[in-house]
A protein has these predicted regions:
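Ligand-binding cleft/hinge of the Venus flytrap
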Residues: 8-17, 94-118, 148-152
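A ligand-binding cleft/hinge motif common to bilobed small-molecule-binding domains
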Residues: 28, 44-53, 97-100, 128-164
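Short helix-initiation/N-cap motifs at beta->coil->alpha
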Residues: 20-31, 73, 112-127, 165
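Alpha-to-beta junction loops
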Residues: 16-18, 34-43, 84-87, 121, ...
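Periplasmic-binding protein-like
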Residues: 62-69, 94-97, 141, 145, 149-202, ...
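Extracytoplasmic small-molecule ligand-binding "clamshell" domains
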Residues: 1-44, 201
């Protein structure tokens, strides 16, 4: 994504490195990394479930799918959603997840709901949640944080997530040295406001976890 590339450019600038952008055949990424023809994988690369295969930077984006409920709903776990009416945005990652029967999919959970209602946008869905027409919302964590922040108290995100998806920079397993340099640079770029500026430019401020 543009965010990844501009952040990579900013790190290279700090180090006096030349950024070489290399399109990857996804199947040969490990070969390229291990042979040294690339130094890292930096493009919306999900670290969860891959921790044993790469040395990862600090995660910089959280794209997990979560459940939002009214604070006083009495809903605390995913199991509590049985028989409830759950809202989700049409054509969203959360909806895909709730329909998926593949490993990591949550169709079994969705089958316990009383109803799964699709909405064109989250503003409408939150209005329905507020009115009590919905018991819960399935939504990505960035949007959830933004909506809750802008609407004030009265909502909570369940501790149990539908899935966990954090993006990090993947280095060859054991290449801690390069990873440490990049982590230190990410910290500098966070402190000087570069990360926040880029996050705003690409409209992902609520997903970026570098603070």
């Amino acid at each position: 994504t543009g965010f990844d590339l501009e952040l990579a450019e900013a790190v290279c600038k700090l180090e006096g490195w030349e950024l070489v952008k290399k399109p990857l055949n996804w199947d040969s990424k490990d070969m390229e990394l291990n042979s040294g023809s690339i130094d890292c994988i930096w493009n919306g690369f999900t670290m969860n479930g891959r921790e044993d295969d790469y040395t990862f930077s600090t995660p910089y984006v959280d794209n997990s799918q979560v459940i939002v409920v009214a604070e006083k709903s009495g809903i605390d776990t995913l199991e509590d959603l049985a028989g409830k009416t759950v809202g989700v945005q049409a054509a969203s990652a959360a909806l895909d997840l709730l329909k998926s029967e593949e490993e990591g999919g949550q169709k079994k959970l969705a089958d316990t709901f009383g109803a799964l209602n699709e909405f064109a946008d989250y503003n409408t869905a939150f209005t329905e949640l507020q009115a009590g027409a919905l018991d819960a919302l399935a939504i990505d964590v960035g949007v959830a944080n933004y909506q809750i922040k802008s609407r004030g108290d009265g909502y909570k995100i369940l501790d149990e997530t539908l899935n966990t998806e954090q993006y990090a920079i993947g280095f060859k397993k054991g290449n801690q040295e390069l990873c440490d340099v990049v982590n230190a640079d990410l910290k500098k770029l966070t402190e000087d406001g570069t990360v926040a500026k880029l996050a705003e430019k690409y409209e992902i401020a609520d997903m970026v976890t570098l603070k």
